[in-house]
Design a protein with these regions (language model features):
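Generic hydrophobic transmembrane alpha-helix motif, especially the helices
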Residues: 121-158
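Transmembrane alpha-helices
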Residues: 89, 167-168, 190-228
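Transmembrane-helix boundary motif in ABC transporter permease subunits
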Residues: 88-120, 133, 141, 285-293
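Amphipathic cytosolic juxtamembrane alpha-helices at the membrane-cytosol interface
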Residues: 95, 108-112, 117, 180-208
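Interhelical loop and adjacent transmembrane-helix boundary motif
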Residues: 65-68, 72, 224-274
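Transmembrane alpha-helix signature in integral membrane proteins
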Residues: 36, 72-102, 210
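C-terminal transmembrane helix and the adjacent membrane-cytosol boundary/short C-terminal tail
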Residues: 7, 103, 169, 173, ...
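Periplasmic/extracellular loop-to-transmembrane helix junction in inner-membrane transport proteins
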Residues: 9-32, 46-88, 109, 250-264
Length: 297
């Protein structure tokens, strides 16, 4: 009996020492993982900056693509990105917010709500090239829109719609139930509660999620490559039915060239794209802070 107790005590001591060893090593392993991730991103960014910094100029945004790297720019790709991303935002943001409000506040059929939530969550994980193939078959050929800006914008809108919907639904869930119940107790209708209680408090997170989804759309190349198929174009888009290209495709075009000067241009274009993404993220932070401050006051 005494030997059994001693053996259990010895096992307990060894297990306790092993747990303490793991506790002491865990911060080191976690810090190593963070360091490796940051170091990888920093090295890639340093390579891009050192390669393309001297190519940054207004000519990069104002000149058309050219076989001569000293005269080449990405004006058409830059304008094409603005057209497609702007139109997709006008489509997906209102629809995503409306869908989130319906799923969280207006839907009374639990089975339908769960079915929609499940499928929206699954759509958020679908590879972007699949959306491009669907857009090609339905919009480009099925509806006869061709390889136009509106086809690319709708494809990006459908791709980002699940992200906007999920983030907006999570924002609505953060609104305190006591505020909604208090408004209902005072005789407010569901529409009034949505307009004056839910939206003002959920809008900062909604806008943040929407801007982050749009930031993802800016850097997408696969669906636009399927829809547009153009890597070289020397004209400004003037309508939603014009042909187009975007910055990621222009970067891919330059990277695939054998000349070192074109690879330098691709690094400069990557820097422009990163600056746009950082600007969108900063805008999301500023808007969220201002709206939260306004709601608090």
């Amino acid at each position: 009996m005494a030997d059994t107790v001693l053996n259990k005590a010895a096992v307990f001591i060894r297990v306790d020492r092993f747990r303490k060893l793991l506790d002491s090593l865990a911060p080191a392993f976690l810090s190593l993982g963070v360091f490796l991730g940051v170091a990888t991103v920093a090295s890639l960014l340093a390579t891009v900056v050192s390669t393309g910094w001297h190519r940054l100029s207004w000519n990069l945004l104002t000149e058309y693509p050219s076989p001569d790297p000293n005269q080449a720019g990405m004006r058409s790709a830059f304008l094409g990105s603005l057209w497609t991303v702007g139109l997709s935002a006008l489509i997906c943001v209102p629809l995503g917010i409306a869908a989130a409000l319906y799923l969280t506040e207006w839907s009374e059929n639990k089975l339908l709500r769960r079915f929609l939530e499940f499928n929206i969550a699954n759509l958020a994980g679908v590879p972007s090239v699949v959306f491009g193939l669907v857009g090609l078959s339905v919009l480009t050929y099925g509806l006869g829109w061709g390889r136009s800006i509106i086809a690319g914008a709708f494809t990006l809108a459908v791709m980002t719609l699940p992200l906007v919907t999920v983030s907006a639904a999570e924002a609505v869930k953060t609104v305190p139930e006591a505020l909604k119940h208090g408004a209902y107790a005072l005789g407010a209708t569901k529409l009034q509660v949505t307009r004056y209680i839910i939206l003002p408090r959920a809008l900062p997170m909604m806008m943040t999620g929407a801007i982050l989804a749009i930031s993802r759309a800016i850097g997408e190349a696969a669906p636009i490559l399927v829809i547009s198929g153009l890597l070289f174009i020397r004209q400004d888009p003037s309508s939603i039915f014009d042909k187009f290209t975007v910055m990621p495709l222009q970067i891919y075009n330059w990277v695939s060239r054998p000349q070192a000067a074109f690879r330098e241009l691709s690094s400069a274009a990557i820097l422009v794209l990163l600056i746009l993404l950082l600007a969108f993220n900063a805008t999301a932070i500023v808007l969220r802070y201002r709206y939260q401050k306004r709601v608090t006051l």
